[in-house]
């Protein structure tokens, strides 16, 4: 790990844009890398070496890093309620990873989080999800939760899944995630309560008409239930 940290520290970051459509660059500096080396010297386990990330005002992060658990250089998409790996960037060595970032970093971030419709598949479009009028059943704010992802701007993940809706409290990691999985051709939801995931079957649906019905009936009560919890 010492060699990996030193190699990352020596990288040329000058080509990275400071801003990409509302996302600001944050680069690991010498102090950050020194802190990682000190932790290793103290016998601590270091599982990730952050290299740089882009972050917007919603707390969405596009992160380039080394992941010791899989022994790969990779890109993690880190959102307030969920995270996943962009496997298209995974490389086993730093040189090819860095060259891949130079070629596709801006495009990768743009397609993933800024213009996510670029990642919509044929199935996602054929189901009519991007053009569906969700305004009645998915209001911008509900029970103190803010909708910051909607079906017209769904985030493509892995294994055929899209995040088509997210409601969250802006100051805490609680809320609701609405998914569409194109392999199973179904909609379903997960809850987050203080970062802990929970399955909720009230929003299970096979098509947009069914989804509209269950959202109309259950979305408000589900979010109210999260508000009413007492630890």
Would you name each region that the model predicts?
Residues 19, 64-66, 102, 136:
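Short, isolated positions within intrinsically disordered regulatory regions of eukaryotic proteins
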Residues 202-231:
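Long, compositionally biased interface segments
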Residues 1-53, 107-172:
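Negatively charged, low-complexity tracts enriched in Asp/Glu with abundant Ser/Thr
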Residues 57-100, 170-213:
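Intrinsically disordered, low-complexity regulatory segments enriched in Ser/Thr/Pro
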Residues 105-108, 119-121, 195-196, 220-224:
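Short C-terminal domain-edge/linker segments immediately following a structured domain
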Residues 34-38, 96-99, 140, 144, ...:
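Polar/charged alpha-helical tracts
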Residues 94-112:
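Short, structured interface segments
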Residues 100-101, 113-115, 189-190, 214-216, ...:
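Glycine-rich loops and low-complexity Gly/Arg-rich segments
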